[in-house]
Amino acid sequence: MAARLLAFLILLAMVPTAIAEDGSVMRIDHSFTLMEYDPGIEDAAIHPASNWVVVVGAEGYAVSMDKSSPSTMIPLADISDSDLLDSDYHPGGNTALIVGENGSVLRYAISDHSLERATSAQSVGYDTMQTVSWNANGEWAYLGSSEGTLYRMRPAGNGSSEIVPMPGTGGSAISSIDCLPDPFVCLVASAEEGIGMIDRDHVLSWIGGSSSTWSDIVCRSGGVPVCIAISMDRSIAEIEFESGVVGLDIQTLDGFSGTPRSISLTSSEQILITATPAEIIEHRPSGDGTFTWLTNEAIVGQSFGVSGSTITGGWDGDSGDHWIITRDGTVALLVPEETGVAQGLPKLVTMLSFGIMGVMAIGIWSTRSSR
């Protein structure tokens, strides 16, 4: 690890990236608020082919924002008074599914910024649907609930949807789902059963990590495919795939005082972990370290309405910029630290490894659907 850190510092000296004394590589440039009252923002979904960010929150709050100029926004139809908790774009980028409390499953269309019910609440048992993710080819979406139910769903024509319950959750709350194109699998983070994997035949298998309560998971398909899960007890799981063998490695953050809340992927495939109190760190898989990105010290010092809330979403802007949104509706632009500021070093967050916690051989490689 010392050799890796030395190599990183040498590389750092060769590139124009500036780093503040507190270890941040980004700073807040400006911010604005969505409204006078707290909209309870829970999620922001973006697609590389779309210019619109879908933002959802409490009591049916839903807007579509221009990703480069989010003050340009379109309120979506008020068709639900339930809290909306998660959203995901179809791989085609033209529609997105939104899920929430009381069996809420909505469909957003970019073409006319319409919002409609994608299926009845009864079809998902009126459960609190807290996560949704499309598989890589867009044939099926997987929906998970806080009650421990898991469904797969696809359009069935005439505005209706086919809903199929999936067994094997053990009744554990499903916190998050994300999918890969190759291997053609989806990974599931749960509160009690650990981390699971859905194969191309829609079979759920648990691969390990049941000692932690996993809150979020993200998969990166570029380069070597990997999925990263986080838990509020500061555990980080890396799921890797090699020749049909799935490996699960769990580590813990030791030099970090925040509570990880969510994990996301930027357009440049940086893996960012958002924590409370408000802070963002960057995780680099395969033992390459976890580093400060925007520290809580910087957020408190710069304020802009971010420090007293929880960061609940983010997306890339232009030319290395990054937008974040907080639960209380503050939208802030992050920009790279300027060359010439007082130089510090990115802080390396210590990772204590628990070793390989689970390995399973399964025929998953190159299993894209023929449809």
Which residues are covered by each model-predicted region?
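Transmembrane helix-bundle segments that form internal channels/tunnels in multi-pass membrane proteins
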Residues: L9-L11, F32
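Sec-dependent signal peptide recognition
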Residues: A2-F8
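Residue-level hotspots at or immediately adjacent to binding/recognition sites across diverse folds
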Residues: A20-R371
